[in-house]
């Protein structure tokens, strides 16, 4: 009975032009395996995303690179085992083509081998998580674009209290005045908070939405200045797309030289549709 079902399925695949005649003949000649084997599951979270965003579709054509996906999964699972000893049981990875935003490899979570059965089904690429310091480059870009900041302009890094809010750096060290480019490269918290206050929270939220972030649904007053230090939630997918467009824009204009005030031309952060 199993052999008949197998052969019938192979013939259906041939009739649908999914396999050629040589593959059909070779497959029909193959004996049945001694036991059932699990179906291949190369990118289960991405498949679930496609099913969710394209209901009723039974077949999907993607831009994924199968070799890259397999290599990413191998490295990903190996590293996740190391991190599990530190109590880190969830992680995600996404690789895109920066020029188009096309997804080339997608790992939504760790533990797909059964090690983390309780939470491995959660797709962290699409899940909302604290932004941490990921929004700082966008604040710097917004201020450069608007003429509020120069790369070598000195920004203040001193103990700061704004109302009841007292931000601090990751290490208890204050540098006084530092170039804006250095403050960004060191991911200093206090300069970022002071810059957000100068630029305006509401204005920055509008800028983030233009960048493609859809998760900022509360008011500027609700987010407050902690927004720049992880007080808001983003998804990894939207962050990767936004960073790709940030990179694309930076690569198409001359580098800043000294204190020269080169205005950044506004640019779209969402990938353009490709047929």
Regions flagged by a language model, labelled:
Residues 1-70, 209, 213-220, 224-230, ...:
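Non-catalytic, structured segments within soluble enzyme domains
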Residues 37-52, 149-204, 248, 252, ...:
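Conserved catalytic neighborhood of penicillin-recognizing serine enzymes
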Residues 2-4, 15-33, 88-96, 155-161, ...:
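Acidic/histidine-enriched alpha-helical segments
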Residues 2-9, 23, 46, 50, ...:
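Stable alpha-helical elements in mature extracytoplasmic
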Residues 53-57, 119-125, 175-177, 185-192, ...:
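Flexible glycine/proline-enriched surface loops and loop-helix/loop-strand junctions
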Residues 50, 86-117, 206-211:
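A short, well-structured edge-of-sheet supersecondary motif
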Residues 62-83, 95-97, 106, 114-127, ...:
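A penicillin-recognizing enzyme superfamily signal
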Residues 8, 13, 72, 101, ...:
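Active-site SXXK
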């Amino acid at each position: 009975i199993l052999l008949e079902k197998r052969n019938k399925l192979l013939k259906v695949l041939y009739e649908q032009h999914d396999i050629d005649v040589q593959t059909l003949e070779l497959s029909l000649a193959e004996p049945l395996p001694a036991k059932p084997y699990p179906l291949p599951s190369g990118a289960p979270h991405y498949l679930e995303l496609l099913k969710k965003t394209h209901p009723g579709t039974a077949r999907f054509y993607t831009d994924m690179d199968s070799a890259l996906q397999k290599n990413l999964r191998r490295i990903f699972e190996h590293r996740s085992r190391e991190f599990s000893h530190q109590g880190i049981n969830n992680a995600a990875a996404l690789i895109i083509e920066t020029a188009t935003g096309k997804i080339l490899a997608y790992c939504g979570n760790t533990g797909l081998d059964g090690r983390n059965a309780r939470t491995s089904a959660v797709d962290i690429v699409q899940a909302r998580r604290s932004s941490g310091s990921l929004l700082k480059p966008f604040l710097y870009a917004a201020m450069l674009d608007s003429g509020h900041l120069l790369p070598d302009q000195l920004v203040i890094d001193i103990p700061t209290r704004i109302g009841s809010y007292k931000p601090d750096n990751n290490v208890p060290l204050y540098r006084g005045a530092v170039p804006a480019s250095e403050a960004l490269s060191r991911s200093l918290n206090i300069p970022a908070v002071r810059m957000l206050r100068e630029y305006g929270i509401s204005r920055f939220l509008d800028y983030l939405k233009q960048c493609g972030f859809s998760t900022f649904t509360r008011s500027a007053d609700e987010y407050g200045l902690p927004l720049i230090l992880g007080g808001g939630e983003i998804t990894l997918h939207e962050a990767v797309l936004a960073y790709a467009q940030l990179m694309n824009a930076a690569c198409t204009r001359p580098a800043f030289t000294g204190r020269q005030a080169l205005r950044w031309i506004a640019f779209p952060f969402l990938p353009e549709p490709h047929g």
